Amino acid sequence: MATETNENLINSFIEITSSSREEANFFLESHTWNLDAAVSTFLDNDAAAAAEPNPTGPPPPSSTIAGAQSPSQSHSPDYTPSETSPSPSRSRSASPSSRAAPYGLRSRGGAGENKETENPSGIRSSRSRQHAGNIRTFADLNRSPADGEGSDSDEANEYYTGGQKSGMMVQDPKKVKDVDELFDQARQSAVDRPVEPSRSASTSFTGAARLLSGEAVSSSPQQQQQEQPQRIMHTITFWLNGFTVNDGPLRGFSDPENAAFMNSISRSECPSELEPADKKIPVHVDLVRRGENFTEPPKPKNPFQGVGRTLGASGSGSSSAPQASSAPMNVAPAPSRGLVVDPAAPTTSIQLRLADGTRLVSRFNNHHTVRDVRGFIDASRPGGSKEYQLLTMGFPPKQLTELDQTIEQAGIANAVVIQKF
């Protein structure tokens, strides 16, 4: 009967402490088969062993859960822990004995060891195995890349949270990661924004010269050499749902047509679609990030629309003003059939300001008459009214009433003549 009772006590001790049979027999015999005292002494020795520092070197990478060495190993003076062969841990089911309830499981590892934990379902995890497989913990977030462990930059980070019976995986969006990397690369190779050249504070007049006839004078070669190409500015705005170029439409990150564009931006290169025809013109690209979705801007309203009309102009003349004003000022229509300019004879230029706002510049000989000038105007406006007057530019204006008077006699050589109805 005593043997059966001792056997039950040994089994209960093993179920509570997960120790070996030899250890259970040793502690029970030391306490005259008092189970409570034997378990208390066993756990106290376990806590004392855990509090002792390890002066010889780093602890083994993994430890067992409530495990114990055999007496032949733990009490032998030649025994040293092995890093390559950790003692196996024992998982057990709930003890049927009611006396096992007050006791819990404790780790046998040292204070500095990488400890394994065991949840009630028997699933174990270890820091030494945190990189095994695809399982990662929150401790990996604080680990720097200098540990020599490569990370796949093409895969999004996955975070796990939850308990024993439920869990959740959170994966960050890859496009946000790509935008972050793009901005990081842009910061590394960024250049200062070009400073606009300060304008001179001088109030002296500068500009291009023009003749009284209206013809523009080409600038001098020195001025042309001093002119530098103007810098082209582009702004690329990154939104949560895409990106825009300047004031263009929204473009998606995953669109295959935008792959080449995004690759050029990530390499800090100007995209081909933004390059000017003249390669000498510098291009500056600004990257702007907005933490919101793109919304279509309202279209600008143009409440004032219509056709300009000149005061004192007839209906037929004013109606053709928009069409006539689009013609260049220094381009004259074909001369009338009776007007022939002799290049060998003295010539002059006359600027004609018509009533509809059109400016015509034509060349005449000095022997041409005022009638020839009117014929030139009538030829340029076949459907226009011929009831008009010609006035010279000046104060007071002089009316040209003598049609047979030559240009030289009328004093309108290289002058401006105004048409008035």
Curated annotation (Swiss-Prot):
What residues does the SEP domain cover? 231-295
Domain UBX, by residue range, is: 343-420
Origin: domain of life: Eukaryota
State the residue spans of region: Disordered: 46-171, 292-338
The record's Gene Ontology cellular component field reads:
cytosol
Q: Does the keyword Nucleotidyltransferase apply?
A: no
Q: What Gene3D superfamilies does the record tag this protein with?
A: DNA helicase RuvA subunit, C-terminal domain, Phosphatidylinositol 3-kinase Catalytic Subunit, Chain A, domain 1, SEP domain
Ranges of biased composition (kind: Low complexity): 85-102, 312-328
Q: Which PROSITE patterns match?
A: SEP, UBX
For bias type Polar residues, the affected ranges are 69-84
- Where is the UBA domain positioned along the sequence? 4-45
**MF GO annotations:** ATPase binding
Record's subunit section: Interacts with CDC48A (non-hexameric) via its UBX domain.
User: Any idea what this protein is called?
Assistant: Plant UBX domain-containing protein 5
From which organism does this entry originate? Arabidopsis thaliana
